Each structure stands twice: as C-alpha cells, then as structure tokens.
Amino acid sequence: ELDASLIIFDDELSPSQGNNIEKMVGKRVVDRAELILDIFALRARTSEARMQVELAQLEYMLPRLTRMWTHLERYKAGIGMRGPGETQLETDRRLVNHRIKLLKERLRDVERSREVQRQSRQHEFKASLVGYTNAGKSSILRALSNAPEVHVEDRLFATLDPLTREADVGDARVLLTDTVGFIRKLPHHLVASFRATLEEVNEADLLLHVIDASHEHWEEHKFVVDTVLEELGANEQPVLLVFNKIDQLDEEGLHALHE
C-alpha cells in the first residue's frame, strides 16, 4: 500500500524469520540488529572500531548468507554436482569464517596493548563515563578535561572508542574515560565484539552514569545501562548519577526529577 522498498523490524529476526518474511512480502527486510550494526559501521573512525564493527557484522551475516543469495538465479545440480550459486555460497562461507578468525586475532593483539596501558595507569584514580547513547557523555568529558579536541555530536553512537583525558577535580587528578553509549536491545554480536572496549568500565574506580534528564524515557534508559553493566560484571562498581541537559526541563520537569 505504501510502496515501500525496505521494511525495518524493531526487533532481531532469526535467519529463517527474515527469509520467510522477505518471501512473503517480496521486499528487502532489515531487523533492528542489522540497522544498528550499519549505524555503527558509519560511525567507526579508528581501525579498532572498524575491526570490532566488521567482526560483529560478519558474525551476524554468517548464518544469513543463504538468504543473501536469494536474488541470484539458482541452478539445480545433478547427482554429485553443485549449482554455481551454491558453490559461490560455500566459498563465501569459507571467506567469512577466515576473516572472522583474522579479526579476532588482531583484536586480541589490540587488547594486549590496551592491557599494557591499563597497567601503566593502575595507580591513578580512574573514572568512566557510561550511559545511554546521546546522553551527553562526550560533552561532559570535554568540559571536565578542558579538551576541545573531544568529538561531540548530537547523534546516536558518535563515540565508539574509549577516550581518556586528564581532569582536575579540586586538588585531585582523575583519568576520565568516555565509553560507547548503550541502547535498548543492543545486538549481542556488538556486545561480544566491543567487550574489550566495554570492559574499560571494570577498571574504573568510579562510574559516572550520565542520564539525559530531558528525555521522556530516561528511567528506561537508566535501566538499560544498569542491565548492560551487570552483564559486563561492573554492577558492583561505585556509581554517581549525573543528570545532564536539565536546562531543557521546565519547572514541572525539574520538580518531577527531584522527586
């Protein structure tokens, strides 16, 4: 009726569900996980972030390769033979598996380097900014560390790499780290690929949980972040709630927040 060329589902579909729906509607189908992965791919700026996103995309794609071949003509093979499409599909599976293995090896090397950096900072007081995507973590990092080079944008997933800057809080020196923002129903492939990055929060002496107080669903966002922190084993870390963007609230909103 709407003559749409693309249908997006706000949930993750299994390979068979995606395949069956595409056959039924005759349109390209994208689920929530694939859409978020595509957004991450657009935002990735460093080599580490690109590798992490590519790994998540490939692991998402692997069980769905057959569906991605449905637009090609298939030939039925005789006994003991395969059609050209099927042969190419098997080749693609091998290539994808090889690439996944290579990316995991490279990311392990990156993690070893990151561990060396952590060891060099073990005697410093470390705080990590965590929160729902676009809550304003990078803006707070820029303000507290007086670092104008910190990238700030009003959009989802503007930060994919942990970024650490020094901040002076009173007479104390703090290493403040910005982290990737969380979101409802974050694809499990992304959590796995970014685990080394996300686990920066486990090394923190204090978590600054940044909340966009102007968002009507901030309580749901807080619950999502708390859940992901628990999955990462960081739910026992000391947490300080930072309500951001309160200047956008009216008196009624401020009163509700105080309550």
Functional labels for PLM-detected ranges:
Residues E1, S5-R28, G170-A172, F194-E259:
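Conserved C-terminal guanine-recognition region of P-loop GTPase G domains, centered on the G4
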Residues R32-I39, V96, H188-F194, G253-E259:
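Short alpha-helical interface patches
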Residues D38, G136, Q248-L249:
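Flexible, glycine-rich phosphate/dinucleotide-binding loops
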Residues P63, R67, K101, K185-H188, ...:
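Residues in soluble alpha-helical coiled-coils and helical-bundle/repeat scaffolds
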Residues M68-L206:
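Conserved G1/Walker A P-loop phosphate-binding module
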